[in-house]
Every structure is written in C-alpha cells, then in structure tokens.
Amino acid sequence: MHPEITILGKTISLYDTMYAVGFIGMFIMCFLSRKRYKLSLPRTLVYTVYTFIAGVAGATIMGYIYTYALDVASGGTYDPNSRVCIFGALLFLPVFMFIFSLFCGDTFRKLMDYMTPGIFFILASAKFGCLLGGCCYGIADEHGVYNANLDYTVFPVQLYESLCTLAVVIILLVIAYKAKKIRTGSLYPIGMILYCCARFFWENYRYYEHDFEQNYIFGLTFWQMFAVISIIIAIIWLVILYSVKGFRDIDLTPGRSKVAIAIDRISSGSAEKNRKKHAEKAKEHEKKAKELKNNAKKNKK
C-alpha cells in the first residue's frame, strides 16, 4: 500500500484521511440514533467532537506509556516509530467520558452506550488507515500485500483487525437495537471483550523488530498484555453492572451544569424556530383549504 496520494498537486495522507472517515461515520451513527437516546442535534455534535478529541488524547497518552515501557525494557535504546497508540483511545476514554458526564447533563452509562458503536467504528477506520499507511504491519508473507515502506509483501494483519472491529460495531448495534434485557452501560465492556479477544489473536501475526517487543512479559507482546487486562476490567464492569443494584441505579450526573444548560438553550432555540415555521405552514395550508372549499361551493351554485 502507499501511505500518500497526490490529488491536484496536493499530497494527502491516507492514514489521516481514514481518521476523518471514522469521525464522519461516528457522527452519522450518533445522528441516526439521537432520537433513541432523546438527544438533540447540537448535543450529538458536541458529544461526537468531544469523544474524538478524548480518543486522540488517550491514544497520545498510551503512546508515551508504550514508548517509556519499551525504553525501559530495551535499556534505553528503543526508538519508536510513532508516539500515538490507538489502543489508548479505548483504555482512557471511559475516564474522559466520566469527567464529561459530570458537566454535560447525561449519565455516564447513557453517554457510553450512545458513543460506543461510533468509537469502535473510528478504531476500525484507523486500523484500515494503518494498512494504507504501511504502519503496524504483519510478518513477511510472499502471499500478502505489498508494503511501500518496506518494499516487500507482508501479512495484512491491519486489514483483519479492521474487519474484526467492524464486526464488533455490527454486533454492538444489533445488541443496542434488538436486545431487550441489556442494561444501560453494557455496550462498552462488551465491545472491549470482543475487540481485545480479536486483538490478542492477531498480535501473533504482527511483526516486531526486537525480542523485547515480541516477548514483553510471560511470552506476550505489550498489546496482548493490555488486551488481557482490558478483558478482565470489562468482565468486572459487567459483573458489577448486573449484580450490584446500588451501582447500576446510582445517577452519576450531579446536576445540570452551565455546559449542559448552554447546549440545551441552543437546542431549545432551534426547536422553537422549527415549531414557529411549522405553525406558519399549517396556517397557510388551512387558508388554502378554506379557499378551495369556498371555490367548490361557488362552482356548485
């Protein structure tokens, strides 16, 4: 694959382009499901933008953690290709979303359920961006795909990760819309378990230059270790959610903040304008209907 293309003299990074595709996809999902969660269009836009920024922040934090961990393991000789690790978006997003729930006027669990399918769609898009950009590539494979950065063919591990993550998105949407006994706040841990199981498997086909990357701890790669940790956390999350009544019933939103009030004012303002427009149109239709009735009576006479 080629990491960049040139259109009308401008060079475009395919990796960054897939992030844009992911953001648009997440917004569309949130837009289509906003009525189900009783959310206005302004809230949908604010939530989508915040989630995207929080995801980038989480990926950046994890990038520094990953670099530091491998630098220690290598004795200070590790030179990272990138300081952004998208796994961090999944791990740190609940923290950022919990903080946001204290100000936005919606509960943490509702917020997570609303954004979860879109979050995993961005992840799927980002992994496909890795394929196009030639990073995070798999082991050498003569039957694989050509990597322009390496000038040889490799196993398309990014493609399979992307497809598996898209499958996770579909499963989450089916659960959200079809499952009758699903508890609010369940979608994210379910998605984490499904994604991390797939990630753990596909890590066996990823290429690592150094032995300390391939065998970081107990024969696992760094990301396999975090996949296991994430699965354990997600299982605990679900157990608490389904078994501890006091936890699942508590309202984590302390009150309406200035941010929530401002968003609602924008929403109510646009809603009021729409109501006035509809009322004016209704009056016009009523007038036309009366005119038609009067004309019909005159013609009969």
Spell out what each predicted region is.
Residues 1-301:
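A feature for loop-to-transmembrane-helix boundaries and adjacent hydrophobic helices
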